[in-house]
Amino acid sequence: MERNHTMTTTTRSRPSRITPQINNQLDMFDLLTLAEPITAPLSFTVDPYTPEEHHKACERWRIEHRNLGIWGKSHMWHCSGYDFGNNRTVAGGHPTVLMSADTRCDHYYPATCSCVGDLLYRMHCEGCGHVTGIHARENAAVEEHLDHCWNGWRNLPTITRKGQDGPWKIPDDYPTEWQIEGAPVRTLRQPMGTRHVPGRSPFGGYDAGTLSP
């Protein structure tokens, strides 16, 4: 007895980049985001936009392309953990947002290239609107911001704290004008741990690491 085998071919239509689908249904939150106008470009730019403008542009890119390689492929400015308050300071009159952009290529060893991209940083002050230049080092962007918004911070005496999460030891003669909300502090560090940390100052500003008092 012979059996007839019928092969059925199903043609799948490619989902639209502009109308993402989740389980064959449109994500209403994505649709609402797509309806909002954006002002920042969906790529790297040297022009200064606000962190909120960059954030909306990143959300648009995520919806159109999904999350796969968003930073390496788009090269857009973004703030890691923007929605959760990471890489930000919120105290005082000069709250900040640290933005970064990955302009590096995706070539891996042993492939060679002549790309000149790098991991770049710039700082936005949401208080006075100051935007730093573009830097290849995070600390350099932070220091430019501090020089503009907290002029004189480099001359502050260093302070210490008891343990990683213990109380800060602020000398009795520490300048009172620098004991205000949002002010940065300087702390002595080891050579491999000099990153300036946002929000870790006892006043809510930057904890700027230094190797010398």
Positions of predicted regions on the chain:
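C-terminal recognition-helix end and immediately following basic linker
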Residues: 136-160
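Short aromatic-glycine-(Arg/Gly/Cys) micro-motifs in beta-strand/loop hairpins
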Residues: 106-131
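Short, Lys/Arg-enriched N-terminal segments with co-localized hydrophobic residues
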Residues: 1-8
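Secreted/processed peptides and extracellular or luminal domains of membrane proteins
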Residues: 64, 85, 111-113, 131-134, ...
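Intrinsically disordered, low-complexity, charge-dense segments enriched in Lys/Arg
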Residues: 67-101, 122, 154-213
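Negatively charged, low-complexity tracts enriched in Asp/Glu with abundant Ser/Thr
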Residues: 21-91
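Extended, solvent-exposed polar beta/coil surface segments
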Residues: 78, 83-86, 132-137, 141
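Helix-coil modules at protein/domain termini and other flexible surface or pore-lining loops
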Residues: 8-9, 15-16, 20-22, 30-34, ...
